[in-house]
Amino acid sequence: MDERLLSGESAYEDADLEYSLRPQTLRQYIGQDKAKHNLEVFIEAAKMREETLDHVLLYGPPGLGKTTLANIIANEMGVNIRTTSGPAIERPGDLAAVLTALQPGDVLFIDEIHRLHRSIEEVLYPAMEDFCLDIVIGKGPTARSVRLDLPPFTLVGATTRAGALSAPLRDRFGVLSRLEYYTVDQLSAIVERTAEVFEVEIDSLAALEIARRARGTPRIANRLLRRVRDFAQVRGDGTIAMEITQMALELLQVDKLGLDHIDHKFLLGIIEKFRGGPVGLETVSATIGEESHTIEDVYEPYLLQIGFLQRTPRGRIVTPLAYQHFGMEMPKI
């Protein structure tokens, strides 16, 4: 996949910044009001009963704050968090090592939990339900199963593809929270807060302009702010004003709706080669040279959100709004 400024996926350079900007409490966390309010109630109730919080599944597009919320849950509960990911747990023994290292009440955060192998999931079921671990010692006829007790813990799973989780795993989560795209006002507040951390002056209109082009995603808003700051320091006086912001975003090929050259390639490919659709996912994948799951998980969610694309039983269709955005007329049937 092309290097993409507007990807919601975490990049290497995002890690340190996101850690330094990460709010520590639900009160500090901007946006996701519904999920935040519910978690506040569930956490307070668990603390009042002196119990661990029910297992939590956070799902939604990348870059919306799932990792941040997992850390906040641990902070609010006053416990430690251990972090891993679905791809990192390759064998049942890997999971057993993580589970047996937990202390009572700890939060275990598994990112990309939909990528756990089914054999790993089966080890996880009794751990989630009964706080125990069944392991097999030996091989062949002499093999025997041993059950180990685990301390009570809270599993927080994060995924961009909730539908890819097996039903037995999904059903074992007591709390399911979908994270939604952020509003422009919420993103503008995040941009201004990040600018304070950077100790750089930003115009409120410039913050709004960055927010409008950030695809409803805080990670993208902060990434755009970093790049605009570069232009402000090199081509301006260091202040992030509206004029330098617009110039920087145009040079970065981020249009007024937050679409970049890859979005243009995707939409125009369907328009020019397939008369706007309908066209099958695999055909689009072959045409633009991207894997189908990348198209589904990375490209399409925002295009669906802004009404530029429709998924139908017959395939993908580019909408009149997209034609209008490109200044093109829809083909006559």
Curated annotation (Swiss-Prot):
Enzyme Commission number(s) from the entry: 3.6.4.-
Binding-site positions, DNA: R311, R316
Record-given protein name: Holliday junction branch migration complex subunit RuvB
Region (Small ATPAse domain (RuvB-S)): 183-253
Binding site for Mg(2+): T67
Gene: ruvB
Region ranges (Head domain (RuvB-H)): 256-333
Superkingdom, taxonomy of origin: Bacteria
One Pfam family hit: AAA_lid_4
Organism field: Bacillus cytotoxicus (strain DSM 22905 / CIP 110041 / 391-98 / NVH 391-98)
Gene3D superfamilies per UniProt: 1.10.8.60, P-loop containing nucleotide triphosphate hydrolases, Winged helix-like DNA-binding domain superfamily/Winged helix DNA-binding domain
Job of this protein: The RuvA-RuvB-RuvC complex processes Holliday junction (HJ) DNA during genetic recombination and DNA repair, while the RuvA-RuvB complex plays an important role in the rescue of blocked DNA replication forks via replication fork reversal (RFR). RuvA specifically binds to HJ cruciform DNA, conferring on it an open structure. The RuvB hexamer acts as an ATP-dependent pump, pulling dsDNA into and through the RuvAB complex. RuvB forms 2 homohexamers on either side of HJ DNA bound by 1 or 2 RuvA tetramers; 4 subunits per hexamer contact DNA at a time.
Annotated stretches, region: Large ATPase domain (RuvB-L): 1-182
Listed InterPro entries: AAA+_ATPase, AAA_lid_4, DNA_helicase_Holl-junc_RuvB, P-loop_NTPase, RuvB-like_N, RuvB_C, WH-like_DNA-bd_sf, WH_DNA-bd_sf
Subunit structure: Homohexamer. Forms an RuvA(8)-RuvB(12)-Holliday junction (HJ) complex. HJ DNA is sandwiched between 2 RuvA tetramers; dsDNA enters through RuvA and exits via RuvB. An RuvB hexamer assembles on each DNA strand where it exits the tetramer. Each RuvB hexamer is contacted by two RuvA subunits (via domain III) on 2 adjacent RuvB subunits; this complex drives branch migration. In the full resolvosome a probable DNA-RuvA(4)-RuvB(12)-RuvC(2) complex forms which resolves the HJ.
Record-level GO BP terms: DNA recombination; DNA repair
Locations listed in the record: Cytoplasm
Family from the record: Belongs to the RuvB family.
Catalyzed reactions: ATP + H2O = ADP + phosphate + H(+)
GO cellular component term, pick one: cytoplasm
Main location: cytoplasm
